[in-house]
């Protein structure tokens, strides 16, 4: 029996082909969990889409089925955890995505699945349409503490965030990470996909508040909460109310 309550977001706002059309601005949508969809002037990018067949029960309906995605210019993957690198989701959309990007280790995993993935070093930049995308550092190598994963040593460079410069502003998704000093030394972004999980391998509540105060002009899109039905796991049970208390 669960011993903690779990915050649940409002009903899902579904979207379809209309969200992928050419537009004269940039739109950002939360996909649930740690995922994000960006349409910038008609260039369509998804990051960490976990849209089907997750191995735990969910609290919400996903806003779009991957089979209904008409086209993508790129899929970005921050790291190998299956709530971010969702192999079933990517297979369902591989025929409509022009490119897949991630850190080198994640790209190797994607290539093994048959995805035409591009691997990058932290700090590298590449362009997708009008968007310039740069990998930012992340500290999330929790696997090194688990015997199950001792087949390799997980390194900082296996995880990343994405800094996305669009014609209309800067979107930053730091990814799953402990708070790093580099996270507090970025230019002012316009939007942050904001993980506030109070977990030792995530930013932690105090770290999240520190980051929010460092970038007071940024709009915060809360993520990594209200998606997986796991009230006793602090990695999934963040509560937006805690940011106000």
Locate each region found by the language model.
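Pre-active-site segment of Zn-dependent metallo-hydrolases
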Residues: 14-20, 37-80, 87-92, 142-152, ...
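Active-site-proximal beta-strand elements of phosphoester/diester hydrolases
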Residues: 27-30, 44-48, 132-138, 170-176
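A short helix->loop->beta-strand "cap" motif at the edges of active sites that frequently abuts
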Residues: 43, 95-99, 215-221
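Active-site neighborhood of phospho(di)ester-bond hydrolases with catalytic His/Asp-centered motifs
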Residues: 46-48, 71-83, 101-104, 172-175, ...
